[in-house]
Amino acid sequence: MQFRVLLGDLSEWKADGLVYSASSTLLPTNSVSSKIHQKGGLSFSASCRTLGMCHVGSAVMTKGYKLKASFIIHAVGPYWVGGKRGEEGELLSAYKKALHLADEKHLKHLAFASLSTEEKRYPLQRAAAAAVPLLLTEGAGFDRIDMVCTSPEEQEAYTKAAVFFWLRHLGEAAGNEQAAMMEEAGPALALLQSCDDAPDPIALSEEVKKIEAIVHPFLKLRKRSLVDIEQAASKIMALYPESRTEGV
């Protein structure tokens, strides 16, 4: 599965399904949901009214109508109230339900907005750190998942979460398993902010070599601390341009 973290407008995204941060009433309450409702048209809004309510931690699906995606998944994440009321569990539940609905329809290419981090005040870094590992593991059966970000800060948070995911998993692997995982991790990290649907093999190979030049010394450390992971992640993050926006 290819996982990309890109800047863009989710309401204009070309994918089989779009997943956005919805309210329990399915009425638009943030900038992304407002654009989706506006561009989806009257039939789209009517289908949301017909569905009525959706509980926090769950998701429902409608057709895309006038949007470029065939299906829209309305995922209801939690409001942040300090992290003591099970917000992370509810957030992950909303992502899981969205993946389940997409899988039921045999969708292959999904595009996600950042759930709960705008009007619901969920801390961005915490949301990204929770969501990305789930998407990379439980979303492995899809061809591609895009995290469509509305700001460079959002893109940086989800990119860093993906880099941390791979560094941690590589560090925990051993022997042949680590070598096999590196063959997957190198291209995955190199393509993380790539806008190209079919990247040039030579250019991709060069990017992978840059990644490996950072990761291999990190993996040779006998004891890897959080500081070591942070340092390796910072070096990988420095390889990406300040922002990458997909042409839609």
Identify the meaning behind each predicted range:
Residues 79-190:
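Phosphate/ribose-phosphate-bearing ligand recognition and processing surfaces
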Residues 207, 211, 216-218, 229-235, ...:
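Cationic, hydrophobic amphipathic alpha-helical membrane-interacting segments
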Residues 174-182, 193-202, 216-227:
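Charged, low-complexity interaction regions
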Residues 1-104:
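Glycine-/small-residue-enriched capping loops at alpha/beta junctions
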Residues 17, 185-188, 233:
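Small side chains
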Residues 181-188, 200-212:
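Short amphipathic alpha-helical heptad-repeat segments
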Residues 192-193, 203, 230-245:
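Flexible loop/turn and low-complexity linker elements, especially glycine-anchored beta turns
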